[in-house]
């Protein structure tokens, strides 16, 4: 059987590994290195350069050298405007999507195309090493990548001519590498700080079972951000001294970025780094040189806010896993940025233990991907991987409420459904608005897309039964289906091209959900009372109509008056009146029911009217979907 390789497609560096003789092996590239820079360049002679050779010529060819493209993959242009200004190449909007412009190649590329060139090199190097053509791979993504970013990564593989067997989360892959040979059960926390993304996952590992308990993260925090802090510091110092902003010169910016990365790496092992860039720019007075010293203390001061941002996902993951730091047996560091001493100290302070450094942070994700590739290729047995979805998924229901169908940290693959109904009489279609996030209300969450189910036979509201099914596959990619149980008609959407999460949306959603839990609950209860009152008024009118002359005139007048007052209170959103009138109308309907039974010679009829003013659908427990959605563009 053909070999399946494991690929860590990183922001700054990528790595490929394969199972050989039951053990994972990292494959060196054609240049002899075990990791390959995720850099693509288009040379003046028309050649496409990938990896180390592309990175080496970046200073002389900044406009045609593309790096950190992972930050743009699967995202809309309006979500990456800040990042677009921080690279030496042009980032453009093409119909709202991101494109990068290469004057040298004379064309624009999608981020997927650039990533595909990196993937192709990795697979070609693996093919040479193995002596056979590699066409299948498992590719890793940050745990907090959303549906669009996961699909875009699969598309990059397809462009590269690779059949992507599985997309798996980077921290989960790291846990596979760490726990591959372990028999005893351990609870581990994977702290994955790479070049552009940050993930934290808590897992139970042992005897071949790898179960993710919780995951959290920040898709825009990584080594690039630490480099940017140094670049800004150096540029500001130079501007103060010489009156020139080096960031406006693309070649100078590229040299600064490379010097910043080099200084950052040096400061992991020494307490100060010399930054010497001769002929960085020139004026009419002659050439200018940059010569500065950066201490580790100054570097840590510059990056204090970034290091502090690492704290929130760790605390969130522990909370979601319902664990305390004392319950963690090992902390596994992943990603080159975890070599920063201040990051290691933060981990130690947060979790009260020295992190485990037995794995190579640059290679461990690719090694884990190779193990998963071995499982899918039949080379490895006895491994069970249970991953999770990082954010809750649901739909918008009446009153603008988000009804969660799949809560965050649900094990995938998974399939869950809910039955909803119509909101008005005679409604022949429903608009399904798919949401992602942790807040109570639709407007506070991220819209993933909408679709319409038509052809519902006209019926009183609450009668049609619309089953909405959420299906997440093992790659974490979502499909939503809505089906009218009466007619069997159905409509579906695959959330692949929807606008994706903004820079700080995910952690902001979780944080604000906690901060606003009380006010969210109060607002939700108000909407539920309003919906309940509206439903009760509808039920009362229906009951009076059905009973006709059997209802005494006095009772009928009283109920009609209460219905009128309650409808006015609902229209004005007068919560106090709704709270007062709802039980009064319930009691009036109860009295009507009792009188009817007594006239017929029976006893009282407790529950003759709905006591909770619930929904009017046949199973009584369904929510209703508001028909007045606006289409997401």
From Swiss-Prot:
Q: Which UniProt keywords apply?
A: ATP-binding, Chaperone, Nucleotide-binding, Phosphoprotein, Stress response
This entry's comment on induction and repression of expression is: By stress conditions e.g. heat shock.
**One Pfam family per UniProt:** HSP70
Task: State the Gene Ontology terms under molecular function.
Answer: ATP binding; ATP-dependent protein folding chaperone; unfolded protein binding
Q: Where is this region: Disordered?
A: 513-534, 598-633
Q: Which NCBIfam families match?
A: PRK00290.1 (NF001413), PRK05183.1 (NF003520), prok_dnaK (TIGR02350)
What this protein is called in its record is Chaperone protein dnaK2
- Naturally occurring in which organism (per UniProt): Nostoc sp. (strain PCC 7120 / SAG 25.82 / UTEX 2576)
| The organism's taxonomic lineage, starting at the top | Bacteria, Bacillati, Cyanobacteriota, Cyanophyceae, Nostocales
